[in-house]
Every structure is written in structure tokens, then in C-alpha cells.
């Protein structure tokens, strides 16, 4: 089985730019895998022949870019693309919030694999900590880049003193802040806490004369392949051949961890299948960035406005035309509930009705996540199959 991958939204390493995280307005990384189907690839070639010059303003280009399909002028081409290619069971989509990536990584590291031994507490803390500011996360990233016992001790002290004021907007959240502080104190009393953190922090990989880590591409690729293996029973690694668009540094990072995996990095200009994956990734990335992030309830009204009617209709199509088991949302449960409500066919008559639907979905989302949760050992077993 050949599967072709490409991505969208500012790929690469999550790092620091000044006093901010470097993803700016491209927080949601999208990876798309296309399982090769000769007839679909042939259809895409015909689509390119038909629309290439029109989309590219009269020029014959090597590729049609997904971002160009989203312009008003190219709406007819976009409609044909969605109805022809974003459907069926051979497309896999992973949407990964880069902030979620950092917060969940921090949470599992600092609280010693919390997601495996207390799923309820893990998601309560995760939803709470998604509100932390960039300064908190830059402190964490700096530690991953400069790991030492002294720096770990300083970071633990910082966590103990941190009041998480930016996360507290209700009495319930004030209690969570206290619970985090108490848990840190309890872990310290068990002994060797600092040593554990020093030994288990995210490692750096030396690539092109720089230390690299926190590259979301690798994790998203692994999540997507796990999703595919979960859906296609008995699919083994020996049956999968991965083709991925060439990306400097990222491909070296992936190769470092996947030494024995069949993965070939190819030029998109020469590979129709990668171009198809690129177009789909660009469409998802552009649309999801219009809907998320959900920072406060004040972000909801715009989603129901007339200005967003085209966005809602289009995002409903791209999410509902393919098998939902082939789409993985690695975002907060709150935002996942919002997306599920937004792509539904419900005609919300008021903001209250929309918000109520989001809250109902949030309540059920926890049970969904719990039923889908795999421990580290279970994940490794599936990945190695």
C-alpha cells in the first residue's frame, strides 16, 4: 500500500521568536495522507489539465496550490475539487494544534505520564492549561533546549510559584490551580522527582548544526499512521510504503526516529499524489484557521454571522464527505466540540442554541476520548505491528 503525505500551515519546529511562539497565525498543523488509487490520480491529472491555467492566471505551472483554489475567482474549481477528491475512504486527515502539542507534552512529562494513570485529571488539567500564555511555554521550550539539573530545579520552582492567573476565569478553575500546586508538592515529596524530569525531558536531535526538537510533523505522521492501522485491521508495517513531500530539516528529523521504516521523500513538482495531498491539506488548514482558536465565548458570534456562511458550508463539505474515522482532531476537547457542532447540519437559530450544542458535545467528548485512549504500551504495540 502506497500512501502519500503532505502538510499545511507553517511546518517545522515549534520554537521561540522574541518572546512569542513562532507559529503566529498558523497554529493548526494539517497533515493529509492519500492512499494511492490509480483512477483517482488519473482524475486529478485531468483536473489539473482543465484548471491549471485558469487557477494560475493564464500561466502553465507545475502545480495547482490549494491556497489558490480558495480564492473567490477559483470557486468553481474548488467546488469540483471537493466533490471529486475529498470523499471516500482513502484520504486521512490529522489536524494538530501546535499549542496542544506543547501543553500535552509538558503535562505528561511533568506529571509523570498522567494521561495513563488518571485520565480524568489529565484532561481537566489539559483543558485548564490550554490557556497558559506564551511566556509559560517559552520557559518550557527553553528548558528542553538547555536541559540540566540546575535548570530543571529552577523550572520546578517556577511551576510551584506560578499562580496560573491567565487560566483562571471561574471559581472551579481557581480550584484546579490549587490542585496543580498540591500535586507538584506531592510529587516532590516522593523523592527523585527532579532526576526523573531531567532523564525524561524531550530530547534534542543534532541536525544541520542545530539542536532540534518539538517538531510536530513527526508526531502527526505517527498519529495518522496509527489511525490508518486502527481502521484497517491487520495492516502491518511491511505492507505500508510512505512517500512524503521533501522538507529540509523535517525529513532528517523523521529519518532519525524512523530508521527502519519504508519512507521516501519526493519532490511534489514531480509527484501528482503529493500534489493532491497538498491541495487537500491546504483547504483544511485554511478553513480550520478561520474557525479556531476558541479563546473565549466572544469568539462564537462571528461563526454564525453572514460573513461566515460560505466558510461553514464549505467546512461542512470537507468534514462530512469523507469517513469521520479518517479524521483525527488533536486539539482541546472544547475546540473539538465546537468543530463537531459547526460541521453539523443543524440550523442554529441563536447564539444560545449554538453554545448549548457545543456544551452538550463537550460533555460527551470526554467519554469519546476515554474510549479511544491508548496507553503508551498499546500505542507501541499497534505502531510496531
Q: What does each of the following model-derived ranges do?
A:
Residues 1-94:
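An N-terminal structural lobe/cap that precedes and organizes the functional/catalytic core
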Residues 89-385:
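Charge-dense, low-complexity intrinsically disordered regions
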Amino acid at each position: 500500500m502506497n500512501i502519500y503525505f503532505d502538510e499545511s500551515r507553517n511546518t517545522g519546529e515549534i520554537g521561540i521568536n522574541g518572546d512569542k511562539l513562532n507559529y503566529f497565525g498558523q497554529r493548526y498543523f494539517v497533515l493529509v495522507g492519500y492512499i494511492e488509487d490509480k483512477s483517482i490520480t488519473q482524475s486529478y491529472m485531468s483536473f489539473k489539465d482543465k484548471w491549471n491555467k485558469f487557477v494560475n492566471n493564464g500561466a502553465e505551472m507545475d502545480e495547482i496550490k490549494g491556497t489558490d483554489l480558495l480564492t473567490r475567482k477559483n470557486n468553481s474549481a474548488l467546488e469540483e475539487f471537493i466533490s471529486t477528491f475529498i470523499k471516500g475512504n482513502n484520504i486521512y486527515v490529522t489536524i494538530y494544534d501546535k499549542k496542544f502539542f506543547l501543553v500535552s507534552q509538558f503535562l505528561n512529562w511533568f506529571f509523570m505520564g498522567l494521561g495513563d494513570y488518571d485520565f480524568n485529571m489529565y484532561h481537566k488539567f489539559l483543558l485548564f492549561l490550554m490557556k497558559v500564555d506564551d511566556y509559560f511555554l517559552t520557559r518550557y521550550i527553553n528548558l528542553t533546549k538547555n536541559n540540566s539539573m540546575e535548570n530543571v530545579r529552577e523550572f520546578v520552582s517556577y511551576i510551584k510559584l506560578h499562580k496560573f492567573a491567565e487560566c483562571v476565569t471561574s471559581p472551579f478553575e481557581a480550584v484546579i490551580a490549587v490542585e496543580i500546586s498540591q500535586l507538584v508538592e506531592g510529587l516532590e515529596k516522593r523523592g527523585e522527582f527532579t532526576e526523573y524530569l531531567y532523564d525524561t525531558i524531550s530530547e534534542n536531535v543534532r541536525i544541520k548544526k542545530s539542536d532540534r526538537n518539538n517538531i510536530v510533523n513527526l508526531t502527526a505522521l505517527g498519529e495518522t499512521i496509527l489511525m490508518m492501522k486502527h481502521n484497517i485491521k491487520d495492516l502491518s508495517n511491511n505492507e505500508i510504503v510512505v512517500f512524503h513531500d521533501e522538507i529540509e530539516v523535517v525529513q532528517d528529523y523523521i529519518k532519525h526516529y524512523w530508521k527502519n521504516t519504508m519512507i521516501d521523500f519526493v519532490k511534489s513538482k514531480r509527484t501528482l499524489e503529493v500534489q493532491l495531498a497538498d491541495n487537500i491539506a491546504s483547504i483544511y488548514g485554511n478553513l480550520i484557521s478561520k474557525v479556531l482558536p476558541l479563546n473565549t465565548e466572544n469568539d462564537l458570534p462571528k461563526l454564525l454571522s453572514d460573513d461566515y456562511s460560505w466558510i461553514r458550508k464549505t467546512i461542512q463539505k470537507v468534514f462530512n464527505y469523507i469517513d469521520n474515522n479518517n479524521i483525527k482532531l488533536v486539539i482541546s476537547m472544547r475546540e473539538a466540540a465546537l468543530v463537531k457542532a459547526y460541521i453539523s447540519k443543524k440550523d442554529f437559530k441563536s447564539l444560545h442554541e449554538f453554545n448549548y450544542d457545543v456544551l452538550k458535545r463537550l460533555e460527551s467528548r470526554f467519554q469519546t476520548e476515554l474510549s479511544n485512549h491508548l496507553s503508551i504500551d498499546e500505542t507501541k504495540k499497534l505502531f510496531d505491528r
